[in-house]
C-alpha cells in the first residue's frame, strides 16, 4: 500500500487557484505540441504554421467536447448547478479526442493538409500528453479504482483530495500511466509498418478504447447505460467504428500494393 498526501492545489495567487491537475494537463498539451515540432525537425512533412493553427483549433474544440460529455454524464448535477458547466473541472479524454479530431477535420477541409498524416505524427505525442495528464489525476485523487486493500493499493490522506479520505483504493490512474507509456513505445515501433496515412491513429483509438472499456470495470464511476460507465459506452462505439475501418483500409492498401 502507498500513501499519497498531496494537496490538489499547487499554489494560489489571490483568488486564482492553480491545481496540479490543471498544471499536468497544460504540460501534456505542451508535450504533444513539442513532440510534433520535434518530428518536423526530423523531417516530418508538416509546416509549423499548420501545427500552430491546428493547435489553436484543436485545443478549444477538444475542451468544449470534453466538457460536453461530462455534462451529459452528470446532467443531474449540472442541471442544478449550471454555473459549474463553465468550470475547468470534469473533463473527459474521449470528449477531448473526439472534439479535437472534428475540429481538425473541419480545418483540413479548408486548408487541404493531410489530416491522416498529421494525426499519425501526433499519436506518440498524444500518448505522452495523456500519461502526463494522468499524473494530475493521480495527484488530484480523481479517477480512482475500487475500494479495498491489495498489495498495490493507495490511500489518500489529504482532506482536499478528490478520493475518499483514508480509504484504500486501486490506483487505476497509475495503471493507465503505465499502459499509455507502453502504447507510446509500441506506436514508435509500429508506425512505419502501417499504411495508408491515418492507420496509426485508428489503431491508437482502437487500443485505447479497448483499455478504457476494460479498466472501467475497476474504476469507481456512476453507471451511464447498460450497467456501464460513460467512457465504456463511448469506447465500445469507437471500437465498433475504428476497428472495421482500420481493417478495411489495411485490405485496400494490400490490394493496391499487389497492383503496383
Curated annotation (Swiss-Prot):
Pathway listed: Protein modification; lipoprotein biosynthesis (diacylglyceryl transfer)
Pfam family, one: LGT
Keyword field contains Cytoplasm: no
Residues annotated as binding a 1,2-diacyl-sn-glycero-3-phospho-(1'-sn-glycerol): 134
Keyword Aminoacyl-tRNA synthetase appears in the UniProt entry: no
Function noted in UniProt: Catalyzes the transfer of the diacylglyceryl group from phosphatidylglycerol to the sulfhydryl group of the N-terminal cysteine of a prolipoprotein, the first step in the formation of mature lipoproteins.
Superkingdom as given in the UniProt entry: Bacteria
Molecular functions (GO terms): phosphatidylglycerol-prolipoprotein diacylglyceryl transferase activity
Organism: Dehalococcoides mccartyi (strain ATCC BAA-2266 / KCTC 15142 / 195)
One Gene Ontology biological process: lipoprotein biosynthetic process
GO CC field: plasma membrane
Alphabetical keyword list: Cell membrane, Membrane, Transferase, Transmembrane, Transmembrane helix
EC number assigned by the record: 2.5.1.145
UniProt similarity note: Belongs to the Lgt family.
Primary site of residence: membrane
Protein name: Phosphatidylglycerol--prolipoprotein diacylglyceryl transferase
Amino acid at each position: 500500500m502507498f500513501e499519497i498526501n498531496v494537496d490538489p492545489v499547487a499554489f494560489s495567487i489571490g483568488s486564482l487557484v492553480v491545481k496540479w491537475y490543471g498544471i499536468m494537463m497544460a504540460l501534456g498539451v505542451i508535450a504533444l505540441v513539442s513532440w510534433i515540432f520535434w518530428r518536423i525537425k526530423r523531417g516530418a512533412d508538416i509546416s509549423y504554421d499548420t501545427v500552430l493553427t491546428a493547435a489553436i483549433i484543436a485545443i478549444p474544440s477538444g475542451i468544449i467536447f470534453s466538457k460536453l460529455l461530462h455534462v451529459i454524464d452528470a446532467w443531474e448535477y449540472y442541471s442544478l448547478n449550471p454555473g459549474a458547466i463553465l468550470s475547468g473541472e470534469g473533463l473527459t479524454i474521449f470528449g477531448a479526442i473526439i472534439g479535437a479530431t472534428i475540429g481538425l477535420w473541419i480545418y483540413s477541409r479548408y486548408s487541404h493538409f493531410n489530416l491522416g498524416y498529421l494525426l499519425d505524427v501526433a499519436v506518440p505525442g498524444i500518448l505522452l500528453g495523456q500519461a502526463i495528464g494522468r499524473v494530475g489525476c493521480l495527484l488530484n485523487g480523481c479517477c480512482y479504482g475500487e475500494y479495498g486493500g491489495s498489495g498495490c493499493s493507495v490511500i489518500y490522506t489529504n482532506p482536499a483530495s478528490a478520493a475518499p479520505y483514508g480509504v484504500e483504493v486501486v490506483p487505476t490512474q497509475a495503471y493507465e500511466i503505465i499502459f499509455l507509456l507502453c502504447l507510446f513505445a509500441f506506436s514508435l515501433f509500429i508506425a512505419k509498418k502501417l499504411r495508408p496515412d491515418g492507420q496509426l491513429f485508428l489503431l491508437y483509438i482502437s487500443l485505447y478504447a479497448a483499455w478504457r472499456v476494460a479498466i472501467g470495470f475497476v474504476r469507481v464511476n456512476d453507471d451511464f447505460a447498460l450497467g456501464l460507465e460513460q467512457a465504456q459506452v463511448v469506447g465500445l462505439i469507437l471500437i465498433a467504428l475504428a476497428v472495421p475501418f482500420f481493417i478495411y483500409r489495411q485490405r485496400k492498401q494490400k490490394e493496391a500494393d499487389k497492383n503496383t
